[in-house]
Amino acid sequence: LYPEWLIPGDETECARLDLELWEQIFYEVQPEPYPAMTYALSWLKEKCPQRSPGIRLVKGNNAMTEEIWQGTRIVAMSDWELTHLGDPAEDWAWAAQQGIGQLWELDKIIDHYQQVSGIQIDPGNLAYFRVFVLFKAFTCLQAGSRMFIAGNDRRVQLGALAFLSHTFLEQIVKLTEL
C-alpha cells in the first residue's frame, strides 16, 4: 500500500513529497558520510520544482531492457520498484540517464512525446530530475553496499555497487557545479 502522506494533493507537492521520502531513505542507508551528497540534497531542496504539469504515474528507472515485447508492440513492463505519483519529467530524466539520447536527440524525443501525449515536460523540471534520479540511484546502490558491508548479503555484486555509486556521485557534482 502506498503511504497516504506520499500521495500528492496537487501539482505543487509532487517533487517535494518524493524528495522528503528519499532524504529519509538516504540517511537510513548511507554506510558512511558523503559531504557531496549532503550538498546535493541541499541543492535538491533549494531547486525543488514548485509545480508539476500534472500528477502522473512515474515508473522510475526505466532501462531499455525492461520492456516485454510481442512483435513490434510493448505488452508489459518490468521493474516497478521506484514507481510513484509525480512529475513525468522524472521518467525522461531516467531515460536520459539510461542513454536514450544516444538513439535520437533527447529534445526531439521529448518534443515527439509532447505532441503525441499532450503532456508537457518542463525543461527546468527535467534539469532538476536529472540530478534527483542520480541521487536516487546513488542511494539505491548504497543500500546494497551497506547490506554487503554489514555481512547481511555477501554477493560480490553488492560489494561492487559501492564503486559504481561513485560514478553517480561524479555526475551529481558536475550537474550541480559543486
PLM regions: where:
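Short, polar/flexible loop-turn hinges at active-site or ligand-entry regions and domain interfaces
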Residues: 1-6, 99-100, 121
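A cross-family kinase active-site recognition segment
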Residues: 1-42, 48-56, 84-85, 152-165
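Short glycine/proline- and charge-enriched loop/turn segments
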Residues: 19-24, 75-77, 90-95, 149-155
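Active-site acidic catalytic loop and adjacent metal/ATP-binding pocket
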Residues: 35-93
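Conserved beta-strand->loop/alpha-helix structural units within folded catalytic cores of enzymes
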Residues: 65-67, 124-127
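Active-site activation/catalytic loop segments of kinase-like enzymes and analogous catalytic loops
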Residues: 89-120, 132-152, 168-171
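Regulatory N- and C-terminal appendages and interdomain linkers associated
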Residues: 160-178
